[in-house]
Regions:
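Extended, low-polarity segments enriched in aliphatic/aromatic residues
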Residues: 2-53, 57-61, 68, 72-80, ...
Length: 376
């Protein structure tokens, strides 16, 4: 069986060729020009970053991709869906304002920006999942499913629940409407350690579902299982490591659901996938802050095979040297820390990522066996 090709270039530049130009060259070498985009609507799925976060991909990278799409005769638009939790991206009006404030405007990115699931996150399409074991019909933002061609542009980084956020996370969770996101999270209810909880209520402020309750007598927080959506937002909000998923089956189920949502998005139409391993923060760009990178900047990857792409990015990260003054570096420096020999697990020990890739391969999203083609 022929290995999937993943194309890679590092962040070194030469006189006269900046990174946006180098990205254009990478995706052309990776075969994006083979897709018929003439007069087609082309969705470019990316994360605009929560307001206050500076870890997200710069608009210049999105502009490079939209320029190539237009060169090929396509009609590109940047897109994402609304979130489950408080912040600037829970409805389309605030989401667009957030994108603009973070530098994503039609002028800077060279194309329109659409919030795919509409004003309140309810404009979705139920899409059957071929071979799905967890999801029968995925709830995907309508504008994403209306597109003729789908391109993912992913900031590859760590994640407090899923270990890392790559193409599958960007597509599967990101393309789900608010109802779709809740469906993917519906097995996961974290627990709170009373001994570690300081009662600061920061987690409560981050919850959109009244899932956290403050006990006035104990001065501690607790989870309300009846209202908790299992989104994991509170885990990243806690500065004291007091909140975690102890039910690893729930995290594994989340990973599998994300893979199946991804399959619903990409099946049946031309797709292409780009991931940048840069500013590798330990947590999701959904937070209003970003901690120091846990790994050095590695480079830009592109492939038709999104699973091979995620695997290549994981492998590159595992071969990188951890940054000392970071969440990962701090953990490794602890005398009693158990080294998992896995940068993502070492950064966030309560996370789990391997089931996502294995389930994705099982349902036919791609292959984890790849050939890395290096572009100078």
């Amino acid at each position: 069986m022929t290995k999937s090709k993943v194309y890679f270039t590092d962040f070194r530049t030469k006189l006269g060729e900046g990174l946006p130009t180098k990205l254009k060259r990478l995706i052309k070498d990776a075969g994006i020009t083979d897709i018929d985009m003439d007069n087609k609507f082309v969705a470019i799925k990316m994360h605009f970053g929560e307001l206050g976060n500076l870890g997200f991909l710069r608009p210049n990278y999105a502009r490079a991709v939209s320029d190539v799409v237009k060169e090929l005769g396509g009609h590109p638009f940047l897109t994402d869906c609304n979130t489950l939790y408080p912040g600037k991206r829970k409805n389309a009006l605030e989401h667009l304002e957030c994108a603009w404030e973070n530098g994503f405007t039609p002028l800077t990115v060279g194309c329109p920006i659409l919030i795919a699931d509409g004003l309140k996150g309810t404009d979705d399409v139920e899409v059957p999942v071929a071979g799905g074991e967890y999801i029968e019909k995925a709830k995907i933002g309508r504008a994403i499913m209306d597109a003729d061609v789908f391109i993912s542009l992913t900031h590859f980084k760590g994640h407090e629940t899923t270990g890392f956020g790559g193409a599958i996370k960007n597509i599967g969770m990101g393309c789900g409407s608010r109802a779709g996101k809740k469906e993917q999270h519906n097995d996961g209810t974290p627990t709170i350690s009373e001994s570690k909880c300081r009662g600061c209520k920061k987690c409560q402020k981050e919850c959109a579902n009244n899932g956290l309750v403050f006990n006035k007598e104990t001065k501690k927080m607790s989870i309300n299982p009846d209202t908790c959506a299992g989104c994991g937002r509170c885990i990243g909000a806690c500065n004291f490591d007091a909140i975690a998923f102890e039910n690893y089956t729930a995290v594994e189920n989340l990973n599998c659901r994300m893979a199946e949502y991804t399959k619903a998005v990409v099946d049946g139409r031309p797709t292409f996938h780009i991931s940048l391993v840069v500013d590798v923060s330990p947590n999701c760009d959904c937070h209003a802050e970003n901690d120091a990178p846990i790994l050095p900047n590695i480079g830009m990857f592109a492939s038709y095979d999104l699973l091979a792409l995620d695997q290549a990015c994981v492998d590159a990260c595992m071969n990188a040297t951890p940054i000392r003054n970071s969440q990962l570096g701090d953990n490794l420096a602890k005398k009693d820390f158990h080294d998992h020999h896995d940068h993502f697990t070492n950064s966030t020990p309560e996370s789990e990522w391997k089931t996502c890739l294995s389930h994705a391969e099982k349902i036919g999203l791609g292959s984890r066996d790849y050939e890395l083609v290096v572009i100078k």
